[in-house]
């Protein structure tokens, strides 16, 4: 069998895939001895997604040889949503062109998902000269984006010494969420210079859907530069987004 991997906690894995599927229709997943990885760009080429799941976060990880499989993300998401929080998730692939998805809990349920041909693009996650790094709770970021969506389709992030602000302005109203290091929601802040950049709320809303309230989210950005948003999966895995800025006129 080319590979068999086991992940304890099916819902957590499902949330990861659901988040990515909000932005991309299909993806090529690479299974290697080191772990599972996926890198893709949304159809509008505004968001780059980078998923890295090392073999250490799986309770069982057996990959005979490196293999890349193409998956329809919407179908994958719908199947994974059938898993429960305490279910064990098993992903298997034999010689046939199917991914076998099994949930083991109160019963053993197995789905077979046909694999598809996906063009593999050579996408690089660039190293950019960010001037601000913000670490905050997922709940704070999600609520800030929801607040901003009431007044605008864009949100501005502003970082300066000891203060991080999320701000949105509409034609008649505005909202501002200000955090300092004294607030529980802001965990860390590193600023080389006062930094401002705006981003589309539609994309951000999709990017944060899978983030838990207590998750730590890392934001890196520069003046009118892309936003790099990252959160960890069981301390060693990582889901990273790179979102193009909304350049103001």
UniProtKB/Swiss-Prot annotation:
Annotated InterPro entries: DNA_clamp_sf, Pr_cel_nuc_antig, Pr_cel_nuc_antig_C, Pr_cel_nuc_antig_CS, Pr_cel_nuc_antig_N
Q: Name one GO molecular function term.
A: DNA binding
> Which CDD domains is this protein grouped with?
PCNA (cd00577)
Its keywords, alphabetically, are: DNA replication, DNA-binding
Q: What does this protein do?
A: Sliding clamp subunit that acts as a moving platform for DNA processing. Responsible for tethering the catalytic subunit of DNA polymerase and other proteins to DNA during high-speed replication.
| PANTHER family named in the record | PROLIFERATING CELL NUCLEAR ANTIGEN
Q: Which cysteines are joined by disulfide bonds?
A: none
Name the PROSITE patterns for this protein: PCNA_1
Q: Report the family membership.
A: Belongs to the PCNA family.
Q: How is its activity regulated?
A: Inhibited by interaction with the PCNA inhibitor TIP.
At the top level, the lineage of the source is: Archaea
Q: Which residues form a coiled coil?
A: none
Report the record's Gene Ontology biological process terms. leading strand elongation; regulation of DNA replication
Q: Does the keyword Transmembrane helix apply?
A: no
Name the SUPFAM superfamilies on file: DNA clamp (SSF55979)
Q: Which NCBIfam families match?
A: pcna (TIGR00590), PRK01115.1-2 (NF002219), PRK01115.1-4 (NF002221)
Gene field? pcn1
Species assigned in the record: Thermococcus kodakarensis (strain ATCC BAA-918 / JCM 12380 / KOD1) (Pyrococcus kodakaraensis (strain KOD1))
Question: What protein name applies here?
Answer: DNA polymerase sliding clamp 1
Q: How does it assemble?
A: Homotrimer. The subunits circularize to form a toroid; DNA passes through its center. Replication factor C (RFC) is required to load the toroid on the DNA. Interacts with TIP.
| A Pfam family it matches | PCNA_N
